[in-house]
Design a protein with these regions (language model features):
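N-terminal pre-core extensions flanking Radical SAM catalytic domains
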Residues: 268-272
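A short glycine-rich, hydrophobically flanked beta-strand micro-motif that places a catalytic Asp/Glu
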Residues: 41-45, 244, 260
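Gly/Ser-rich oxyanion-binding loop with an adjacent helix/lid
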Residues: 3-131, 280-285, 304
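C-terminal nucleotide
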Residues: 1-18, 114-259, 273-325
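A local structural micro-motif
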Residues: 39, 78, 95, 173, ...
Length: 325
């Protein structure tokens, strides 16, 4: 039996329920972006990445699909950034979601026990080793409240950043400095524009400082920067929520926690906490007591990006992920 579906028709689907449609539509566009003939195939998708939790489930599927198609066709991307950009286009052009590039880059370029420093001006990257990461864990806590970033909320923040950059005569706030914030205040820009710009400018500096801290094996400093990041997301960018703030404040009560912050776009979803291995169970217990909802916990560490795996290894890793979840 042969069954075919026009991929062009998928592009006209209503995507208001993003988390239910983007995986299918992104996969369809990845097939389109592959040059040459793609042979027919049957596919089963298994995942332990929760959908709609702000953990980049869409990018994970896009990059995994592209990696599979490289293996299937024998046509491997010459440059890793080209692969990441192709997956981003799948979301932009086919799913209609104006996502950034960070999620696709880490899914493609991730290395075990490393962080990835990405400069979005020229898409240059640097692998940052995390030498003593084995002493710590990243505890991901899913608030299980919908990860909802409305189009109006997203556009308001994006437009505020564009407006601030325009007033400063910059191509983007990536070129701005803390001194430029005074210019915005002198120009009597609306308070919300100043706040959005302050978050972006300080977050860029925190990212640079975080990479430097990891290179010095200073996880204490790295944790402090995580805390500062969340506080800025909460007060200046205003994308946190009562649920996320509760998870973060609860985690910070535990002595073995170095830092905790929301992850993803905010407005629900997950937090990520850097914690010493011997304190992770205490963190989970405290959160269960403090958080009125039902949180889900995932223990994670920096791992490699998408790659081809034998079925035996894949099943073993999948079962391990289920146990850790």
């Amino acid at each position: 039996m042969h069954y075919s579906v026009s991929l062009k028709n998928l592009a006209r689907m209503q995507l208001s329920a993003f988390v239910h449609q983007v995986e299918l539509t992104s996969l369809g566009n990845i097939l389109i972006t592959m040059k040459g003939t793609v042979p027919g195939f049957d596919a089963v998708i298994l995942s332990t990445v929760p959908v709609g939790a702000g953990l980049s489930s869409s990018a994970a599927l896009e990059v995994a699909t592209y990696t599979f198609l490289e293996k299937l066709t024998g046509r491997v991307s010459k440059k890793q950034e080209e692969k990441a950009l192709a997956c981003q286009r799948a979301e932009h052009e086919f799913a209609g979601v104006p996502c950034g590039i960070m999620d696709q880059f880490i899914s493609v370029m991730g290395q075990e026990d490393h962080a990835l420093l990405l400069d979005c001006r020229d898409l240059s990257t640097k692998q940052i080793p995390m030498y003593d990461i084995n002493e710590f864990l990243f505890l991901i806590t899913n608030s299980n409240t919908p990860h909802k970033l409305s189009s109006s909320a997203y556009c308001e923040r994006r437009d505020a950043c564009y407006e601030a950059a325009k007033v400063l005569g910059k191509k983007s706030l990536r070129e701005a400095t803390l001194d430029d914030l005074q210019v915005l205040e002198i120009q009597k820009m609306p308070e919300y524009v100043v706040k959005r710009a302050r978050h972006v400018i300080t977050e860029i500096q925190r990212t640079v400082d975080a990479a430097a801290a990891l290179e010095k094996d200073d996880f204490t400093k790295f944790g402090e920067l995580m805390n500062q990041s969340h506080d800025s997301l909460q007060k200046d960018y205003e994308v946190s929520s009562v649920e996320l703030d509760t998870l973060v404040s609860s985690a910070r009560e535990v002595k073995g926690v170095l830092g905790s912050r929301l992850t993803g776009a905010g407005f629900g979803g997950c937090t990520v906490t850097l914690v010493r291995k011997d304190a992770v169970n205490e963190v989970i217990d405290v959160i269960k007591k403090r958080y009125p909802g039902k949180a889900t916990f995932y223990i994670a560490k920096p791992a490699g990006g998408a790659r081809y795996m034998s079925t035996d290894i894949a099943k073993s890793d999948f079962d391990s992920d289920i146990e850790n979840a």
